[in-house]
């Protein structure tokens, strides 16, 4: 597998370089369960990946050794009153690997949980919604050094033109 790696045993001389780094075998599974009760819909999804490549001491990988090992999503779509519905999504993710911060320290990814919610008002020819992502303002890094946004909201509408 071609990857960007850094050999930290070289200390200050360590540089990122693109190399044919490793052979990686992956195995995984993905499953989901859906349930509809009256007009309410519930769904649980889970995926798992295992790679047999062990992380080498002193080698920091940019891509090959970082992957999402566990992902669990629990969703509910609930009608509240006529035309108004609530969608809730809970996501738990556990990523394997590490990233290098601006000071040069190697940090391992931490599992995190995020909850999103969406209120939708739907008519025959139009719908409007307001959505809150990362509802509980969780601080996390999903990939690399990039810190993901805290709580944020969006709103929108759509028209159906015959």
Language model feature labels by segment:
Residues 6-9, 88:
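Conserved small-residue
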Residues 13-100, 156:
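Gram-negative outer-membrane beta-barrel transporters
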């Amino acid at each position: 597998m071609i990857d960007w790696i850094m050999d930290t045993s070289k200390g200050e001389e360590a540089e990122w370089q693109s190399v044919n780094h490793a052979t990686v075998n992956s195995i995984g599974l993905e499953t989901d369960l859906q349930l509809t009760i009256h007009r309410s819909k519930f769904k649980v999804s889970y995926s798992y990946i295992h790679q047999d490549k062990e992380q080498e001491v002193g080698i920091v990988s940019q891509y090959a050794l970082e992957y999402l090992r566990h992902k669990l999503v629990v969703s509910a779509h609930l009608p509240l009153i006529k035309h108004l519905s609530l969608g809730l999504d809970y996501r738990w993710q556990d990523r394997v690997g590490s990233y290098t911060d601006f000071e040069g320290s190697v940090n391992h990814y931490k599992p995190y949980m995020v909850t999103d919610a969406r209120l939708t008002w739907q008519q025959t020819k139009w719908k409007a919604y307001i959505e809150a992502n990362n509802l509980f303002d969780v601080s996390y890094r999903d990939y690399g050094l990039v810190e993901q946004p805290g709580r944020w909201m969006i709103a929108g509408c759509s028209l159906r033109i015959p």
